[in-house]
Amino acid sequence: MTRVNRNFKDSLFRMVFHGKEELLSLYNAVNGSAYTNADDLKINTLEDVVYMGMKNDISFLFASYLNLYEAQSTSNPNMPLRGTIYFADLLKGWIESNQLDIYSERQIMLPTPKFIVFYNGLKEEPERKILRLSDAFEGQQDAEAALECTAVMLNINYGYNRELMEKCQMLHDYSWFVDAVRQGVRAGKTLENAVDEAIDKSLKEGVLRDLLRKNRAEVKRVVLAEYNEELHLKNVRECGYEEGRIRERIELIIKKIRKGQSLEQIANALETTTDQLKEIYEAVMKAAPDYDMEKIWEELKIK
């Protein structure tokens, strides 16, 4: 029975692909292979690597490849950088466990790193996208960099990458289930009700049946945690946007006041009403003559 490590919030992706058989099926689908020797797959996930409180990565050694699979609900161009750091730690552990000498005159042979990002966010993305560490380098793009890390991002939202889904039933079921939850939320159901209904529907349709029968409560807890994390990040972004908008308006009002303009004149210049500007205007006037931005901001937050 799949159990969730209580030291972190696991992701549904990790629960679905927790077993070696399921992980090998995903590997075969991604690589177009047909391996059946799941016991040869060695999982070596770094258990202390947690992103935003959520554990959403799986790494494993198989067929001379060092694989890093990560599920993402946001489009993140910094995945290659994270992959570089992750692979460095994995290779360090691999070298130590195999007692290899990096100072030897002999060439040390290493497993080939492969980084796959499984994307199921709401932002529109292509079915397949290549992300490179070198895209972040500030130097000339034609200059030869000493380091590179490439991540292949696959869009696994329901309806995308159909051929890949046909090759891996568990990936199809994962995508179908996530879509079922989202449909429930879009229909106006509470998140908890949407998850419950998606689970009931999945059991009826035979989607993720074994996992849901054995771990219904665990799956529900994990999905609620994931969606709450998404909502938190969305709220943080929205709050940041709103703060930036207000600070920009404060700066404009300060400039107008220094030019001797009244509240009415400023409102006319900004094409708004005095009522909409009054609170900020009064906070700015209170901070005269220094007009300290942070003091003005704190004054507005108190109000």
Regions found by a protein language model. Give the residues of each.
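Elongated, amphipathic alpha-helical interaction scaffolds
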Residues: 1-303
